[in-house]
């Protein structure tokens, strides 16, 4: 499990949990950042983290992204399946 702020551009992840104050967590949940949702990281180059969530592109600060914990989804081309990896 890693914070979203450390995930590379192009990676697909599954949200595991959000560690934040209640009001901030509620706001993130309202945006769609809930456990078991998948996210694709579009950009993560210092400033904001740009993600695609449910077909919508969203930008969040690195500080907020550090509070969203995820597992990376790896595609295994040889076996035509996806694997979630806990780190």
Regions found by a protein language model. Give the residues of each.
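C-terminal structural segments of small proteins and small subunits
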Residues: 50-87
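Short alpha-helix capping/helix-loop boundary micro-motifs
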Residues: 23-27, 44
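A structural micro-motif recognizing beta-strand termini
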Residues: 17-21, 54
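Ubiquitin-like/PB1-type beta-grasp interaction modules and other compact soluble beta-rich domains
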Residues: 2-6
């Amino acid at each position: 499990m890693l914070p979203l702020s450390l995930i590379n551009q192009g990676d697909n992840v599954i949200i595991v949990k959000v560690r934040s104050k209640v009001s901030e967590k509620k706001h993130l949940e309202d945006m769609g950042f809930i456990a078991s949702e998948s996210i694709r990281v579009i950009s993560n180059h210092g400033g904001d983290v740009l993600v695609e969530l449910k077909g919508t592109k969203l930008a969040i600060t690195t500080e907020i992204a550090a509070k969203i914990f995820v597992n990376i989804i790896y595609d295994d081309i040889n076996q035509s399946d996806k694997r979630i990896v806990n780190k």
